[in-house]
Amino acid sequence: MENQPKLNSSKEVIAFLAERFPRCFSAEGEARPLKIGIFQDLVERVGGEMNLSKTQLRSALRLYTSSWRYLYGVKPGATRVDLDGNPCGELEEQHVEHARKQLEEAKARVQAQRAEQQAKKREAAAAAGEKEDAPRRERKPRPVARRKEGAERKPRADKQTSKALRAPREEKHTPVSDISVLTVGQSLKVKAGNNAMDATVLEITKDGVRVQLNSGMSLIVRAEHLVF
């Protein structure tokens, strides 16, 4: 007895029970509904074996009967079995309904976890996109070359006229104050420093607006970075 290996986890206990009572427990596939009061039967049949305690048996049974494959097996017309696989009565309707609710709740929890993980991935991707599209530092203006001695000074009027001709007309943009007015496919601009890049609205989310730039890159942008 002292040299018997010890089972450390509920999964190991379930594997042991499936090997010891194959007509009752299964390690994979759809499980058969268990006899009511089977815990006491287990204590009497395997008590002391593999150094198993009542707490380990109870935890293993709880894990086994809450698994999806077991809940799938609890359905109308199914029959409970004892440790030797003998039928012990058909399932009652209330037990079937309870198992159905447990299965629905378990699926809902998994879907919620997946949705949360997807949201975190989208936020991380959006943050990476904003960093990638962050405006570069503006270059300092080149120092004006000094006029060489003896060189003729051009008339100031001509210089001002040429500057006026070269100066681009500054575009005026209207900031987007409410993203609810936007629609998918609408054209707008994304502010990046002193520049504004053309973009198209792809999706409006709670985190901002997903847009696609002319370069083909898509990212989520907050409203304060959008203008018409």
UniProtKB/Swiss-Prot annotation:
Pfam families: ProQ, ProQ_C. InterPro entries: ProQ, ProQ/FinO, ProQ/FinO_sf, ProQ_C. One of its GO terms (molecular function) is RNA strand-exchange activity. Keywords: Chaperone, Cytoplasm, RNA-binding. Residues 117-136, 146-175 have a biased composition (Basic and acidic residues). It is found in: Cytoplasm. Its main location: cytoplasm. SMART domains: ProQ. One of its GO terms (biological process) is post-transcriptional regulation of gene expression. GO terms for cellular component: cytosol. The keyword Cytoplasm applies. The keyword Chaperone applies. RNA chaperone with significant RNA binding, RNA strand exchange and RNA duplexing activities. May regulate ProP activity through an RNA-based, post-transcriptional mechanism. Belongs to the ProQ family. This is RNA chaperone ProQ. It comes from Salmonella arizonae (strain ATCC BAA-731 / CDC346-86 / RSK2980). The gene is proQ.
